[in-house]
């Protein structure tokens, strides 16, 4: 995303800017769908679908790069604001229903709001420190990749720990998966035609984050399919 202040896109990039903007809007819609579906599943199953630690990181990222810093791209500004609003709603439902998943750990169960407050505050401070160190443009994109890595790993661990599909769905998985990797279109054009600001895309750390996230997403989809298959089998067995 374009948080590189004081710079303008070169003419060779401008020819493809409309393609990047279109991909950005698709990405924005799919992640908005993810947040909406997560809120719906929270209400329906009285639980939460996004793991607590990654959710705090993701929410802090949206807070920092919507309220404190702002994208130079008008579409990204609209999308980030929309995400922050929807994520706030989702977090509210998460705080409300999270105690249902922590009956085995009363200390956690009684302190869910404080855990979220402390988690978000810590991630906000860390992200502001990183932005002050390397600049908001680089920090924003690095942390976006980190957030997604944490979300994928956290979601898979949570799914396997629960052994149940409560709080999640194929819609949540696919909107997260496709909504992230449609961003490859943006990355391709910005890296090739705006290298002054986006050469970091080719750094080993970004390749590492992207590769691990992709592998985990595929494993998540297979695991969700297997668990849903087991749940359908149990329903059939109970109906006999």
UniProtKB/Swiss-Prot annotation:
Membrane topology, record value: Multi-pass membrane protein
Biological or metabolic pathway of the protein: Secondary metabolite biosynthesis; terpenoid biosynthesis
Main enzyme class: lyase
A GO cellular component annotation in the UniProt record: membrane
Reported biotechnological use: Compounds in the chrodrimanin family such as chrodrimanin A or verruculide A exhibit strong inhibitory activities against protein tyrosine phosphatase 1B (PTP1B) and therefore, they could potentially be developed into drugs for the treatment of type 2 diabetes or obesity. Furthermore, chrodrimanin B, the end product of the pathway involving chrodrimanin A or verruculide A, does not exhibit the PTP1B inhibitory activity, while it functions as a potent blocker of insect GABA-gated chloride channels.
GO molecular function: lyase activity
Assigned keywords, A-Z: Glycoprotein, Lyase, Membrane, Transmembrane, Transmembrane helix
Subcellular location: Membrane
TM region positions: 16-36, 48-68, 78-98, 112-132, 134-154, 167-187, 205-225
Glycosylated position list: 197
Primary localization class, coarse: membrane
Swiss-Prot/TrEMBL GO biological process terms: terpenoid biosynthetic process
InterPro entries from the UniProt entry: PaxB-like
Role summary: Terpene cyclase; part of the gene cluster that mediates the biosynthesis of chrodrimanin B, a meroterpenoid that acts as a potent blocker of insect GABA-gated chloride channels. The first step of the pathway is the biosynthesis of 6-hydroxymellein by the polyketide synthase cdmE. The prenyltransferase cdmH acts as a 6-hydroxymellein 5-farnesyltransferase and produces the hydrophobic metabolite verruculide C. The FAD-dependent monooxygenase cdmI further converts verruculide C into verruculide B.
Protein name as it appears in the record: Terpene cyclase cdmG
């Amino acid at each position: 995303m374009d948080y590189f202040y004081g710079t303008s896109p070169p003419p060779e990039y401008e020819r493809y800017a409309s393609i990047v903007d279109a991909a950005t809007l698709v990405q924005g819609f799919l992640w908005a769908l993810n947040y909406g579906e997560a809120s719906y599943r929270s209400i329906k199953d009285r639980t939460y679908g996004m793991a607590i630690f990654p959710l705090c990181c993701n929410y802090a990222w949206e807070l920092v790069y919507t309220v404190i810093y702002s994208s130079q791209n008008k579409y990204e500004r609209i999308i980030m604001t929309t995400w922050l609003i929807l994520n706030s709603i989702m977090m509210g439902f998460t705080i409300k229903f999270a105690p249902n998943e922590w009956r085995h750990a009363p200390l956690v169960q009684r302190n869910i709001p404080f855990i979220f407050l402390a988690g978000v505050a810590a991630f906000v401070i860390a992200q502001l420190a990183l932005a002050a160190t390397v600049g908001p443009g680089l920090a924003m994109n690095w942390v976006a990749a980190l957030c997604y890595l944490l979300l994928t790993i956290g979601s898979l661990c949570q799914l396997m720990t629960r052994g149940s599909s409560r709080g999640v769905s194929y819609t949540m998985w696919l909107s997260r998966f496709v909504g992230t990797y449609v961003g490859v279109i943006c990355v391709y054009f910005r890296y090739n035609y705006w290298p002054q600001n986006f050469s970091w895309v080719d750094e080993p750390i970004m390749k590492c984050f992207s590769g691990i996230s992709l592998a985990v997403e595929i494993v998540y989809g297979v695991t969700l399919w297997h668990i849903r298959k087991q749940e359908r089998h149990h329903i059939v067995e109970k109906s006999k």
